[in-house]
């Protein structure tokens, strides 16, 4: 065999086998194909091999004759390139011919002796998705599994066979490598040209014929210029080459490990025809996206070239060494120096800097990474904003499902006004269009994106999450672990590549080492930090919200505390100070072309944001509004959880007295910042809109005052003196006035959106504006007439008024009555006979009437399930007290109110099931007593009732709902 047929530039080289279609992605999952064979198949092969070994002893002469005849036919087939060859990727022909007949006879004997039903034939190959998910595949294209779950069905991974390579092929490859090295070195010493006979077109064709795997699609790889040849020569002429030539003899037969050591990793030669696994280019590209050098890991990674790997050009292989100054040399094999052969940092999949070692992140699988697919298979990534998190979720969920989950996150409850459909999205902090922009999305941290997918996966109805039933729990658990790992809790310093030169010196401040907590002097003096830090606060909010709605409410305080603390450090409660516009450099103008179109004409303000004091940075009005909405959301949840968990307030009114109130949600999603008009500052106390910031935030402002009053009253030393002073009465009157102001604004809000005058001009307002409906939900455009949209708006308005009225009455009860249910039932101070009890009882009946309206407009209580439970519970305690004390003498209004509360609790359990809502059992037993049905074990039921209520205490040391 001529040595010129095995050249380093063999045109038959392909990053994936030539038997594949060029339209498939050259991705593979190394090490998983050997697990695809079942145990039954392995036992059958073992039995066949044993019988073949027994038969081979009695058929030696015939086998040798067949072997010689088969070798002759093989030589003839080499001279005939049009023949079909299948021995290049398998073991030597002598081995196959020696066991062909015994194997065939053994198979026929097994089939004759089998009395069972016909054995189902195994498919030759499973698709990439089924292979990765370890599911059954029918071998079709597309297969039934991918069609059912809407996955991309591909057969792109490399075909691999078992066993080690043939010694003959390894020896020939080593000899060819040594001959090629000696030829290259002699040519370089003579100063002659690089081209030799081995690179002539005729020899190139003969090499294809001998290899038996000629593919004309890769002819472009043979057209090398003289400059490229000289670059190859410079890379090939290195000291390591001589050692390799001297150590390997042409006719020796080294073992497999020695042969692989002799050939460099990037030496693409006829060794690709053997059975050793090849380096997968998509694997390297995926790992490169995990640890990009010189880029911000919080920004979207650059998408890899869209063109396919039709030839191994410099673009496709430049990612293998991003520091290479001459990427064109990557077209050829390269025997680098010792400095170049250092193992890259990303090959070990070590966690990124500053990340905790307690969370093993799953390595991304390239099988589901659509950026590497060829041109005939377009990418399924509808939303480029997901690019930073794609390498991390590739082994968890498909790309199409990730896009669907992002849609679920931004889906609205109502087509007329914005209201999140997911019970775990309490308010919209970000603009939907900024996230779902097809070309210029918002730059997001991977942790925020992972948390959004995790929140949406809690309630999504996608088939991938519902079949089998355990799929949702498994996927949500993986997304949760990924979110925590990407968030790096309590570590919010600069990411790798963003650190300043004096960052290490700033890690020790006044003798205190702060490096473990990601604190630097630059950040302590800044007005804010980069957008990634704001994303971290939003990620904490997502984690805390879902945990708060579960049975682990006490654990949610950790996440809420982290969110409140980081928000205070970032000074989200303050407006960023405006500054004079500074002259922009040419580079800034060029960078402006990459900004979202909705942000270009916005008034930009210059401030120092996480880059040291005095560093100018343009902050758009959208980014300012994100900061405001994030603060006001944390402000509202702080007061809500202070009631739930019987805790003092964390965020004070003083911290945000100069902060603008959130803008209208419809205008916010439309990006119409110029139409906002006059805006008030400080905490609001009047209803102003349909969103959580419009009707619920004012109630939480008033609740904060009630919580402060309650904490002062329960103070162990000063509480008694405060309750008996005139200051107590003054504070109660002020809070009562604020509640009355809110009630009046609620009536004005209802009349403004439901009166005939408002309906006459509705065509020009946001409730029927099609442009705004595009930002609400896909179903917003389903209403065909203006009348139906107006009706939806009226229903939504009445539902908001019902919820606001109910919570307002509950706040009246909290202000005038007792919070703890056991103290209510014991009634040691005879509060039940006071005037304040009669006032509070009237508000309890009013709250029950509002609950009846809520059940009429929102039967399943899905409008605000995260917030509503505690107010329903606190509004029920007085009714329970009346039913327990009065029993059969209760008024019809009290009985009707108790029935309404029981219905509301049952509906609330269906929507958002939590343990404390078993209070409905207590209410049912009390309602039975009111109707005259006295059980025989009346004393036991009363004792059991108090045991249930004793779990949730609002006394001095009680923890409320946090068990």
Swiss-Prot record:
Low complexity bias: start-end ranges: 8-18, 56-93, 178-188
Superkingdom of origin organism: Eukaryota
SUPFAM superfamilies xrefs: Zn2/Cys6 DNA-binding domain (SSF57701)
Positions of the DNA-binding region: 127-153
Keyword entries, A-Z: Activator, DNA-binding, Metal-binding, Nucleus, Transcription, Transcription regulation, Zinc
UniProt-listed GO biological process terms: DNA-templated transcription; positive regulation of DNA-templated transcription; xylan catabolic process
CDD domains the UniProt entry points to: fungal_TF_MHR, GAL4
Stretch list, region Disordered: 1-30, 46-121, 178-213, 322-349, 576-597
Polar residues: compositionally biased ranges: 19-30
Molecular-function annotations in GO: DNA binding; DNA-binding transcription factor activity, RNA polymerase II-specific; zinc ion binding
InterPro entries from the UniProt entry: Transcription_factor_dom_fun, XlnR/Xlr1, Zn2-C6_fun-type_DNA-bd_sf, Zn2Cys6_DnaBD
Cellular compartments per GO CC: nucleus
Subcellular location: Nucleus
Nucleus among keywords: yes
UniProt feature, compositional bias: Basic and acidic residues: 200-212, 585-597
Family: Belongs to the xlnR/xlr1 family.
Biological role: Transcriptional activator of the xylanolytic system. Involved in the regulation of extracellular cellulolytic and xylanolytic genes and in the regulation of the intracellular activities of D-xylose catabolic genes in the pentose catabolic pathway (PCP) in response to the presence of D-xylose.
Matches recorded under PANTHER family: XYLANOLYTIC TRANSCRIPTIONAL ACTIVATOR XLNR-RELATED
Name of the featured protein: Xylanolytic transcriptional activator xlnR
Organism: Aspergillus terreus (strain NIH 2624 / FGSC A1156)
């Amino acid at each position: 065999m001529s040595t010129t047929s095995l050249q380093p530039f063999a045109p038959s080289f392909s990053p994936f086998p030539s038997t594949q279609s060029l339209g498939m992605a050259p991705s593979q999952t190394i090490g998983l194909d050997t697990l695809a064979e079942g145990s039954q198949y392995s036992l059958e092969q073992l039995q066949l091999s044993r019988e073949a070994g027994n038969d081979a002893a009695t058929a030696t002469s015939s086998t040798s004759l067949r072997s010689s005849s088969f070798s002759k036919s093989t030589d003839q087939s080499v001279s005939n390139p049009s023949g079909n060859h299948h021995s290049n990727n398998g073991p030597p022909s002598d081995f196959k011919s020696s066991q062909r007949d015994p194997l065939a006879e053994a198979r026929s004997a097994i089939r004759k002796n089998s009395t069972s039903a016909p054995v189902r034939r195994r498919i030759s190959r499973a698709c990439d998705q089924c292979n990765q998910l370890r599911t059954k595949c029918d071998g079709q294209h597309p297969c039934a599994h991918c069609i059912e779950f809407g996955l991309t069905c591909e057969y792109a991974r490399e075909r691999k066979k078992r066993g080690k390579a043939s010694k003959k092929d390894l020896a020939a490859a080593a000899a060819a490598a040594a001959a090629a090295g000696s030829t290259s070195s002699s040519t370089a010493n003579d100063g002659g040209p690089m081209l030799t006979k081995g690179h002539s077109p005729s020899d190139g064709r003969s090499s294809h014929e001998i290899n038996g795997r000629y593919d004309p699609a890769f002819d472009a790889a043979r057209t090398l210029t003289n400059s490229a040849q000289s670059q190859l020569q410079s890379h090939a002429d290195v000291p390591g080459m001589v050692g390799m030539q001297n150590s390997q003899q042409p006719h020796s037969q080294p073992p497999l490990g020695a042969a692989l050591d002799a050939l460099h990793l990037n030496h693409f030669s006829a060794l690709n025809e053997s059975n050793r696994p090849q380096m997968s280019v998509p694997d390297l590209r995926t790992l490169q996206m995990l640890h990009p050098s010189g880029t911000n890991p919080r920004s979207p990674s650059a998408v890899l070239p869209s063109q396919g790997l039709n030839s191994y050009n410099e673009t496709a292989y430049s990612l293998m060494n991003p520091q290479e100054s001459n990427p064109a040399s990557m077209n050829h094999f390269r025997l680098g120096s010792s400095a170049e052969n250092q193992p890259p940092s990303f090959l070990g999949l070590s966690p990124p800097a500053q990340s905790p070692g307690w969370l093993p992140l799953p390595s991304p699988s390239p099988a589901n990474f659509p950026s590497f697919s060829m041109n005939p298979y377009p990418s399924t990534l509808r939303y480029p904003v997901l690019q930073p998190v794609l390498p991390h979720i590739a082994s968890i969920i498909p790309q199409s499902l990730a896009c669907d989950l992002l849609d679920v996150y931004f889906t609205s409850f109502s087509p007329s006004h914005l209201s999140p459909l997911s019970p775990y999205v309490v308010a919209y902090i970000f603009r939907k269009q900024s996230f779902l922009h097809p070309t210029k999305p918002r730059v997001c941290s991977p942790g925020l994106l992972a948390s959004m997918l995790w929140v949406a996966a809690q309630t999504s109805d996608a088939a991938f999450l519902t079949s089998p039933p355990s799929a949702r729990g498994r996927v949500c658990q993986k997304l949760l672990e990924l979110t925590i790992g990407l968030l790096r809790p309590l570590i919010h310093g600069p990411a790798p590549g963003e650190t300043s030169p004096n960052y290490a010196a700033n890690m020790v401040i006044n003798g205190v080492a702060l490096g473990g907590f990601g604190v630097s002097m630059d950040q302590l003096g800044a007005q804010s930090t980069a957008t990634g830090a704001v994303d971290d606060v939003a990620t904490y909010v997502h984690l805390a919200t879902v945990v708060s709605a579960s049975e682990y409410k006490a654990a949610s305080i950790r996440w809420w505390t982290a969110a409140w603390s980081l928000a205070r450090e970032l000074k989200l409660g303050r407006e960023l100070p405006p500054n004079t516009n500074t002259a922009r450099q040419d580079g800034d103008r060029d960078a402006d072309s990459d900004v979202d179109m909705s942000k270009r004409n916005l008034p930009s303000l210059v401030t120092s944001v996480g880059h040291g004091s005095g560093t100018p940075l343009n902050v758009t009005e959208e980014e300012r509004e994100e900061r405001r909405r994030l603060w006001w959301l944390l402000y509202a949840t702080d007061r809500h959880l202070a009631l739930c968990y019987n805790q003092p307030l964390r965020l004070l009114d003083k911290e945000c007295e100069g902060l603008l109130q959130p803008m209208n949600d419809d205008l916010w999603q439309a990006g119409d910042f110029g139409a906002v008009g006059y805006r008030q500052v400080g905490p609001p106390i009047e209803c102003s809109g349909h969103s959580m910031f419009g009707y619920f935030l004012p109630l939480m402002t008033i609740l904060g005052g009630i919580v402060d009053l309650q904490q002062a009253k329960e103070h162990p030393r000063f509480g008694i003196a405060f309750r008996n002073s005139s200051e107590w009465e003054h504070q109660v009157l002020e809070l009562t006035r604020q509640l009355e102001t809110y009630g009046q604004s609620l009536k004005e809000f209802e009349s403004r959106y439901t009166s005939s005058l408002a309906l006459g001009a509705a065509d020009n307002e946001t409730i029927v504006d099609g442009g705004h409906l595009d930002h609400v939900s896909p179903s917003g455009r389903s209403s065909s007439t203006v009348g139906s949209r107006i009706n939806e708006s009226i229903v939504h308005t009445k539902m908001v008024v019902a919820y606001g009225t109910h919570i307002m009455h509950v706040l009246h009860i909290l202000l005038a009555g007792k919070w703890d249910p056991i103290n209510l039932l014991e009634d040691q101070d005879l509060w039940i006979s006071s005037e304040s009890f009669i006032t509070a009882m009237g508000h309890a009946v009013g709250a029950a009437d509002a609950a009846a309206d809520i059940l009429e407009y929102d039967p399943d209580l899905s409008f605000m399930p995260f917030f509503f439970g505690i107010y329903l519970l606190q509004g029920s305690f007085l009714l329970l007290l009346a039913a327990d004390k009065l029993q059969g003498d209760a008024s019809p209004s009290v009985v009707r109110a108790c029935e309404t509360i029981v219905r509301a609790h049952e509906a609330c359990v269906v929507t958002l099931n939590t343990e404390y809502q078993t209070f409905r059992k207590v209410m049912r037993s009390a309602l039975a007593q009111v109707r005259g049905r006295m059980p025989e074990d009346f004393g036991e039921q009363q004792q059991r009732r108090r045991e249930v209520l004793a779990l949730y205490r609002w006394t001095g040391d009680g923890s409320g709902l946090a068990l």
